[in-house]
Amino acid sequence: MNLNNLDGYEDSNRTLNNSLNYPTQKALSPSLKNMNYQDFLSITEREQPEALASGNTAINTVVSVTGATLSALGVPGASFITNFYLKIAGLLWPENGKIWDEFMTEVEALIDQKIEEYVRNKAIAELDGLGSALDKYQKALADWLGKQDDPEAILSVATEFRIIDSLFEFSMPSFKVTGYEIPLLTVYAQAANLHLALLRDSTLYGDKWGFTQNNIEENYNRQKKRISEYSDHCTKWYNSGLSRLNGSTYEQWINYNRFRREMILMALDLVAVFPFHDPRRYSMETSTQLTREVYTDPVSLSISNPDIGPSFSQMENTAIRTPHLVDYLDELYIYTSKYKAFSHEIQPDLFYWSAHKVSFKKSEQSNLYTTGIYGKTSGYISSGAYSFHGNDIYRTLAAPSVVVYPYTQNYGVEQVEFYGVKGHVHYRGDNKYDLTYDSIDQLPPDGEPIHEKYTHRLCHATAIFKSTPDYDNATIPIFSWTHRSAEYYNRIYPNKITKIPAVKMYKLDDPSTVVKGPGFTGGDLVKRGSTGYIGDIKATVNSPLSQKYRVRVRYATNVSGQFNVYINDKITLQTKFQNTVETIGEGKDLTYGSFGYIEYSTTIQFPDEHPKITLHLSDLSNNSSFYVDSIEFIPVDVNYAEKEKLEKAQKAVNTLFTEGRNALQKDVTDYKVDQVSILVDCISGDLYPNEKRELQNLVKYAKRLSYSRNLLLDPTFDSINSSEENGWYGSNGIVIGNGDFVFKGNYLIFSGTNDTQYPTYLYQKIDESKLKEYTRYKLKGFIESSQDLEAYVIRYDAKHRTLDVSDNLLPDILPENTCGEPNRCAAQQYLDENPSPECSSMQDGILSDSHSFSLNIDTGSINHNENLGIWVLFKISTLEGYAKFGNLEVIEDGPVIGEALARVKRQETKWRNKLAQLTTETQAIYTRAKQALDNLFANAQDSHLKRDVTFAEIAAARKIVQSIREAYMSWLSVVPGVNHPIFTELSGRVQRAFQLYDVRNVVRNGRFLNGLSDWIVTSDVKVQEENGNNVLVLNNWDAQVLQNVKLYQDRGYILHVTARKIGIGEGYITITDEEGHTDQLRFTACEEIDASNAFISGYITKELEFFPDTEKVHIEIGETEGIFLVESIELFLMEELC
């Protein structure tokens, strides 16, 4: 059962059933009758555990070497380095000792494999040579540090460095002889640690020793390669050894766990600090924490019959916790039970530790978390809490005991003394048995006194409970320990690089998890869940709040995205990251090369002494794994940030120009020029006045070059819809902004539209005279955020992109200066790395999350008479759409060649063929339309309609005119197309015909252009649009439409009605005067439609002559049933000359 997944619980009262059940098996046992106490002792002595690591020189030595290495991480200073070599040499090559041989012997015993004599002898010989060379190098280094200008001292130290470096390169293969990699692993790790430390000196001092820069770089690159090589070798063979010891029995697990514990101490703890020998990445003293957990042997005498004891898998699954955040023991609540002795004459009853539960805290947190119960509480006789409350327990002394029965033996722990730096805590079930089990034997200190030099602290206790009816019973506690360096506080120092492991978080955002580490990281890893948030770390800042820090994150992933750091829930750092590997597996399978670093270019200051640091991911390229190893804080001096700004600005300005600074680089955008100018503006004029002035002049020159190459008129949007300049033309819904966090100059703000026929738009045509033949041009710009923004560049056809860009450049709360203006210098960190078009995603023609955009357009031949030009258009056609963008430019990209040249020639030919076809088609339509329009009018001046012209005929002429294509551009209906002059001419005549038609009609609103205005109607009558005309709709037989009109008495009138009946029944229009004279037109669905009226989709025009006897006439529209649609009612004088 998993006892460890308790991070989400403040307390848990559930009992964890650790009981291990085995088949009943009786065994022969000596009779206990008449046995005295001495006879009993002779039996129990045989039950004592085998000799542990008490006084083990190998273990004692490696913990001291690890301690010395941890104290000299990074670049701690020259005196530290020489003292480090002195201490290491004294530990690994003592005058009277064979430490290297003991390293081999220790591992040989653990894996039961002897090293062949020749392999051992060769390795020892190589190590002796390295020891001698180290002694000479250390003395030469110390001598040179005392007189660094002395040529002899320089020559001596350089020579000795080359000798010992060569010896290491030559000797390392002797420490990994095929077949003996595991028993030689401690030797390999110790030698690798020394070699990497030595290579650091080349980078630090090589220039002073006369090394060439190439030689220094070669040594540095070799060091980086060796860090990776040495790390992977050690973890590979550690895992191989562990796998070799995998077994099935309790005793096999004991040995398996000892190998794991001792090889962590003798190899992996050192491997975890290999990267800190890199003097460029860790350029000052460095503080780190080893968060791995080790388990001392079970607190028990040897089980008399281990074959039926707890199994290997039961021990591993129950005694060993699953990966978890680092926690700190606060309290043990222990239950005491009793084993009754078979005979008090032989031995006393055993009051023993039968169960417990653990209360613990996370790093820098006051909340207590309590596990369920380990062991068995049934029948307990007492219980109590044993509190530690920040008291580091560095040692335990225990009294494991056994009660002997004729056929069983019951194991238990009577006492445990917990030694803490703030005092001792004593669990005592009774005091009849001696404290014989000492954790120091397995986890020795780094010297005396132990309470000051201890290396590990107790962090947790698990237990195995075994019960069988007729054989051995046991409750066995197992203690787990963390390294002393993994302290409760995450201290951030003013003068040291601080590396905080990710498992020092106090909270993970569900479903982020802790996973087993690969071995070389010094602990486990945090793996992101499906959400962006990873978790929170609490830190203690041991420096003035004015201190600034750079931040670095070590990670492994096969995805790209953005890594965000929040401080006190305020986003403080953002930067893009790339994948470190192409494919990724589980955390335990990662290699050294799987990891990379996210480094932030801007510095931070902490707002208080106990900040909360939150790690967060966004914009991930896919949903694959992301592992966090650690976050690092690197202190910088007071002017560091200003110097960084200057260097960054100088580099940025230089990248704007081609060689000779006569032109801008092709990939430099107008937006980039603006952003570089902001970088220059942010340089301190007090510290770097001359440099700032020079850079300002250069960036102004760059801006002039940007303007001069831009083919767009009015790039700053000062004269939209100007009659004086043939530049931008736009609709309503556009606002011109000026100067914010993202844009230095003017920018555009587009809002959505309620009507797709009338979008929010802005366009400009680049004149043919500005273009070159067979040349590629690029439209470029920058978008802060947008939705449904469509961008077009058009020549022979349209290049079109829909641009949806997230509003993710800046935090929710933007920095301002004392005047309330945008603090661009503070905001610049968020704009440093925005996605390029190449990093964006394209789906269904929509370019997503690319703040920079670019569209190509190619020219063919140039014809100034045709003046085809290049059209540039931006529009939004949806209500939800919006956009904020600027820095628009169209620039020459270069000649069109190769396949692109063939393609543009084909496009031009295709366009010309299409244009010729369109011209022929348009001429035919024009002839038909002109003839239809001529037939409407009574004279050439189009001043009167012919008497018999109906609405349907005018509509028919209009339909012919509307069939003319390319009257307006397809991409924006307000922009005239190639047929616009012809269309305008004919449309004017159509409009004139409708006007004359309406003028002669005495029926008000007879075409229902104004809806139901002027008509008296029932509530169920409506007007709807159909085929460009308004149509009156009657759906019910009781619907009624009325209008009274005034006519000339005794004059003749003609009534024209264009209508359509659907379904059974009939529709009718009745005209009646006051004396009751009535005429009526009827429409049914089965009437034959005149082919000449087919253009209005089934509508029929009917007419009648009416001679009123009174001035007032009543017109009624109705139906008997079904649906009746009326398109037009016209009543005009017979004698009217129309």
From Swiss-Prot:
Name of a matching Pfam family: Endotoxin_C
Key word Glycosyltransferase present: no
GO molecular function, one term: toxin activity
Similarity comment: family membership: Belongs to the delta endotoxin family.
Further details from the record: Toxic segment of the protein is located in the N-terminus.
Biological function: Promotes colloidosmotic lysis by binding to the midgut epithelial cells of Coleoptera. This protein is not toxic in its natural form. It is highly toxic to Colorado potato beetle larvae after an in vitro solubilization and trypsin activation step.
Protein name (database record): Pesticidal crystal protein Cry7Aa
Naturally occurring in which organism (per UniProt): Bacillus thuringiensis
